[in-house]
UniProtKB/Swiss-Prot annotation:
Organism phylogeny: Eukaryota, Metazoa, Chordata, Craniata, Vertebrata
Cellular location(s): Lysosome
Gene name in the database record: CTSH
Protein name: Pro-cathepsin H
Major place of residence: other
PROSITE patterns: THIOL_PROTEASE_ASN (PS00640), THIOL_PROTEASE_CYS (PS00139), THIOL_PROTEASE_HIS (PS00639)
MF annotations from Gene Ontology: aminopeptidase activity; cysteine-type endopeptidase activator activity involved in apoptotic process; cysteine-type endopeptidase activity; cysteine-type peptidase activity; endopeptidase activity; HLA-A specific activating MHC class I receptor activity; serine-type endopeptidase activity; thyroid hormone binding
Record has Oxidoreductase as a keyword: no
Active site: 141, 281, 301
Protein EC: 3.4.22.16
Length: 335
């Protein structure tokens, strides 16, 4: 029986209490110039009062980024679309409020004994990984992890790449213990698609990034799930086998203070937990490899292609980093 998971789907850049911690910073003219350049890049406009607040938050973030990058780490941070946001705002807009019970995700995956290829990247095998999407300010990462895995599964089985409807999962999957923008689990979403007899395409059920009434039309379903492979909790080697031999794998992990501004490199953290009750963001492992003796996962995120490494990140493999092996699964498509 798995513990209760309290999931979020956006990440958390810990600024301390930003409203007070960042409000008294002495800002240089260079920092102001850099902020204005960032505003242009990200098409940001503020009132005069809000400008001063955003400037303080931005400078606080930027200084933390520079301090991190000056240290000896396996990954770098960088400015991105979240750089003018405080932790409280991120928590309000992105973090899930509904706890998720992983007891429904009991392991049924039987792994072999290997050996497995030293590296794998489904993106390089053909058109088997759909483009990076953007969940916006809705805790719907679980829907993007779900559709990404099923899009890959269908493409691997048929050679046809689909774009599936995350909004259908947001609106319609509540009976499988999912809660729209407040949270959910890919394993439960796969079960919903399986018993619901399909999921529609993005073109017929477009993404809104907010909770709405279910508008599923069975005759317009274009992808179906035959079964769900749920990997035994904390069996990271089974995740390697699944990604190597079968399909990209959906998983959840705990985002902590230094992840939101990730730019490149192999992410690792000493502040996150390895327990299933702390994971808070769902993503998709599309491959794995090793660099300078450090094994890593190649992971597709849902924060748009401008975030991280063109929408992807690397995270250390083999240590259950941030609980990433706690809740892993992938769909077996009905084709």
């Amino acid at each position: 029986m798995w513990a209760v998971l309290s999931l979020l789907c956006a990440g958390a850049w810990l600024l301390g209490p930003p409203a007070c911690g960042a409000s008294n910073l002495a800002v240089s003219s260079f920092e102001k110039l850099h902020f204005k350049s960032w505003m242009v890049q990200h098409q940001k406009k503020y009132s005069l009062e809000e400008y001063h607040h955003r400037l303080q938050v931005f400078v606080s973030n930027w200084r933390k980024i520079n301090a991190h990058n000056a240290g000896n780490h396996t990954f770098k941070l960088g400015l991105n679309q979240f750089s003018d946001m405080s932790f409280d705002e991120i928590r309000h807009k992105y973090l899930w409020s509904e706890p998720q019970n992983c007891s429904a995700t009991k392991g049924n995956y039987l792994r072999g004994t290997g050996p497995y290829p030293p590296s794998m990247d489904w993106r390089k095998k053909g058109n088997f990984v759909s483009p990076v999407k953007n969940q916006g300010s809705c805790g719907s990462c679980w829907t993007f992890s779900t559709t990404g895995a099923l899009e890959s599964a269908v493409a691997i089985a048929t050679g046809k790449m689909l774009s599936l409807a995350e909004q259908q999962l947001v609106d319609c999957a509540q009976n499988f213990n999912n809660h729209g923008c407040q949270g959910g689990l890919p394993s439960q979403a796969f079960e919903y698609i399986r018993y619901n007899k399909g999921i529609m395409g993005e073109d017929t059920y477009p993404y809104k990034g907010q909770d709405d009434h279910c508008k599923f039309q069975p005759d317009k379903a274009i992808a179906f799930v035959k079964d769900v492979a749920n990997i035994t909790m904390n069996d990271e080697e089974a995740m390697v086998e699944a990604v190597a031999l079968y399909n990209p794998v959906s998983f959840a992990f705990e985002v902590t203070n230094d992840f939101l501004m990730y730019r490149k490199g192999i992410y690792s953290s000493t502040s996150c937990h390895k327990t299933p009750d702390k994971v808070n963001h769902a993503v998709l492992a599309v491959g794995y490899g090793e660099e300078n003796g450090i094994p890593y996962w190649i992971v597709k995120n849902s924060w748009g292609p401008q975030w991280g490494m063109n929408g992807y990140f690397l995270i250390e493999r083999g240590k259950n980093m941030c609980g990433l092996a706690a809740c892993a699964s992938y769909p077996i498509p009905l084709v």
